[in-house]
UniProtKB/Swiss-Prot annotation:
The keyword Transferase applies. It comes from Homo sapiens. Widely expressed. Belongs to the sirtuin family. Class I subfamily. It comes from the Eukaryota. This is NAD-dependent protein deacetylase sirtuin-3, mitochondrial. The active site is at 248 (proton acceptor).
Amino acid sequence: MAFWGWRAAAALRLWGRVVERVEAGGGVGPFQACGCRLVLGGRDDVSAGLRGSHGARGEPLDPARPLQRPPRPEVPRAFRRQPRAAAPSFFFSSIKGGRRSISFSVGASSVVGSGGSSDKGKLSLQDVAELIRARACQRVVVMVGAGISTPSGIPDFRSPGSGLYSNLQQYDLPYPEAIFELPFFFHNPKPFFTLAKELYPGNYKPNVTHYFLRLLHDKGLLLRLYTQNIDGLERVSGIPASKLVEAHGTFASATCTVCQRPFPGEDIRADVMADRVPRCPVCTGVVKPDIVFFGEPLPQRFLLHVVDFPMADLLLILGTSLEVEPFASLTEAVRSSVPRLLINRDLVGPLAWHPRSRDVAQLGDVVHGVESLVELLGWTEEMRDLVQRETGKLDGPDK
């Protein structure tokens, strides 16, 4: 009986760790350290976790031996998707013929999963607007990329001739992506901080798309906003940090690359703006903004997708090429009965090569697509007032 008593006590202690939430601030919590893997893995993983803390299978628990912390789960790392085989040319010629914004429903495909969509019928942009107006969609998850920031004056990383990469030709980069790779950063951090100076919060202002997302939040419809952007314009527009998952990092915080001491992003702003590489005042190591480089783990908040996407009743995808994983594959994480609305220049990612019958694509200029949706929603006046009010705050009385 004593043996089983100690085992029950150990299990209760471990369960106490599991129930903590990912959103708990300040470092890696117990849920982040063990909860996702143990809860999602099932009974075998729980018992394996107990065995991992106390030896091989069948070894009695030692009451005098404290529980050891289970290993931290592997957080997804950023990497670029390999190009998939091109779709038939006649298909793409029908949607790339001009720059005019067009709307169409993507044809149904064979989808396996709960809530199959093949019998739901196709949707249009107006149908999506009516679902929102009728509050049939109240848990909206949004995925955004660099395309929503280009109207603010920030060039797209991958646009030939206008991307930020092309502005760094003065540096002897072995290839453009090297600026976001740790080995090159440790060898020469100057190119990255030149880029950081241009992107640092305060240099650019939100545009209509950012304020549309803010309006979704104000109306209580935004479950979560997943952004690939590091410009911080979602925060500037007034969307609270609790609603954001900045999948590729943020300038709002920074970390010493040597002693791992954390710093507020504003602490290194003066150095960045003065073209100086920021240094840790304790160990003199380089202080790097918490931007995710290729091969680095994504922020712990990215794990919220495990809960958010199954709960979503509408997925909006705005201004992204869906080329970087694991962000791109999140589009497949919603239920197959959930509408997916893409507002983008081109048909991309799973919506191109694995479409569903309830997919809607509004192709063309992103801002024009958002304005069309706002008009169908009847939010034009509210949007205009919000933009004027927030722009006035950013400009200030003396500007």
